[in-house]
């Protein structure tokens, strides 16, 4: 059986000493999409932000348990969070391009690493925008502001910005919820293509999206991971009544 690329064990997250994520254990596997579903406030986004230590930015957060990536607990004091976030990139719910050109958005992380060679930057821009399925739409206006793009295009530029740092894992927090159906469909097509080269985890409120995209699904309720397994099996024959009720729209 394929070894997981990342292992979460007994992870708990406290906000102001209130336990909002409760002893969660979950594996992410190479070249798979894992969907995280559940009602609002159930802990999905909290888990996602724990995987690349975005929760560190909130001083009121305390975390226990472990997340093992590359053989090391990412919560070890030795972990360089800047390097970690290059390998485990994140795309947010609202498209958040920087107020600069499309080109500069994509190479932002590379410039932070000190890369100045134009040929390297040019290659990264083209390959990353192609990876995000937007190259043909913007190749003739790379020096236009990314803020002037449509919402769906902005989100794909944000995906390209993540790809440019050569991550192994991409985290997506409801990446299509602010988009129209056509733009959302383009994002979904892009994610399915990216699965060949990356591992993805996506928080989604859409059961249809989870069933279309994901290989595995985890169902969260009030901070607990109640059920996790292959998506087809979970949607066809959930083990927990709470899972069945949520998938069928009876609550949440």
From Swiss-Prot:
Annotated CDD domains: ABC_PstB_phosphate_transporter
Name the record gives this protein: Phosphate import ATP-binding protein PstB 1
EC number: 7.3.2.1
Assembly: The complex is composed of two ATP-binding proteins (PstB), two transmembrane proteins (PstC and PstA) and a solute-binding protein (PstS).
Organism listed in the record: Streptococcus pyogenes serotype M1
Subcellular localization(s) per the UniProt record: Cell membrane
GO molecular function: ATP binding; ATP hydrolysis activity; ATPase-coupled phosphate ion transmembrane transporter activity
Membrane topology: Peripheral membrane protein
Cross-referenced SUPFAM superfamilies: P-loop containing nucleoside triphosphate hydrolases
The protein's role, per its UniProt record: Part of the ABC transporter complex PstSACB involved in phosphate import. Responsible for energy coupling to the transport system.
């Amino acid at each position: 059986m394929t070894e997981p690329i990342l292992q979460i064990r007994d992870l708990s997250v406290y906000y102001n000493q209130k336990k909002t994520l409760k002893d969660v254990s979950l594996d992410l596997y190479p070249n798979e999409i894992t969907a995280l579903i559940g009602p609002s406030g159930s802990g999905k986004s909290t888990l996602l932000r724990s995987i690349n230590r975005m929760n560190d930015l909130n001083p009121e957060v305390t975390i226990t348990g472990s997340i093992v990536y590359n053989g090391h607990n990412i919560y070890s004091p030795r972990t360089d969070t800047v390097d970690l976030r290059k390998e485990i990139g994140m795309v947010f719910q609202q498209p958040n391009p920087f107020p600069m050109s499309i080109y500069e958005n994509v190479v932002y992380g590379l410039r932070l690493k000190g890369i100045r060679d134009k040929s390297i930057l040019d290659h990264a821009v083209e390959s990353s925008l192609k990876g995000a399925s937007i190259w043909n739409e913007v190749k003739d206006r790379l020096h236009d502001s990314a803020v002037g793009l449509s919402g769906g295009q902005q989100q794909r530029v944000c995906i390209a910005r993540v790809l440019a740092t050569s991550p192994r894992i991409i985290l997506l927090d409801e990446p299509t919820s602010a988009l129209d159906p056509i733009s959302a469909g383009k994002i979904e097509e892009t994610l399915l293509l990216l699965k060949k080269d990356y591992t993805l985890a996506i928080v989604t409120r859409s059961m249809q999206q989870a069933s279309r995209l994901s290989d595995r699904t985890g169902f969260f309720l009030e901070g607990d991971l109640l059920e996790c397994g292959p998506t087809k099996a979970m949607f066809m024959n959930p083990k927990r009544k709470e899972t069945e009720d949520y998938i069928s729209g009876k609550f949440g």
